[in-house]
């Protein structure tokens, strides 16, 4: 089952013989899952997901587009008015899961100043990598670039948050849903020198955003590279094999 297909109670109740669902995508929580996990659990259906297969492509997508924006290589004036390196650019990352860690590592390799906001602090990353935790308002106010790597259906940015961000900023969203309220981002994009990049249409939000030439959507998952598909396939098969072995042992 891919993340593009919703498998709810209305589907599962007509599939009397289903005992196992192997998700070909990440499985973080009931709220973000496209499979009705509560109903599956009540029916005794085992559901497995996979992780850590497409993070490298996401990091490359963010890094490549930021380099173009800082250098003005996309046909618009550079973000800071003159050509800039990533060195010293203040990057605020929302969330600190696997893809966020990959983005942070990629940008840190170019000497970006990495800050992050997460529901739980990551002291080991702060000590080992030198990343800095900030509360959301401070991060939005101080950072030049905001990267949302949040779980699906998590919304953190409303009108107040975009007012704090102000102009002269870049927002990346690589989540599978918008991380913002749609009217709020439209108002923000009406300001001078504001930029929004996302990879999937699921993460874009209202497609009318693309009427603004400062909103750019790749229209495909940046993480689904050739190598990522190979990793995904192997992990799905491993999960299925483990399930079959468990059933054989019963």
Placement of each model-derived feature along the sequence:
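Rossmann-like adenosine-cofactor binding region
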Residues: 5-11, 121-208
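A short helix->loop->beta-strand "cap" motif at the edges of active sites that frequently abuts
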Residues: 15-20, 42-45, 111-112, 167-169, ...
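Glycine-rich NAD(P)-binding loop of Rossmann-like domains
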Residues: 72-103
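Aromatic pocket-lining residues of Rossmann-like dinucleotide-binding sites
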Residues: 106-107, 165
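NAD(P)-binding Rossmann-fold cofactor-contacting core
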Residues: 109-127
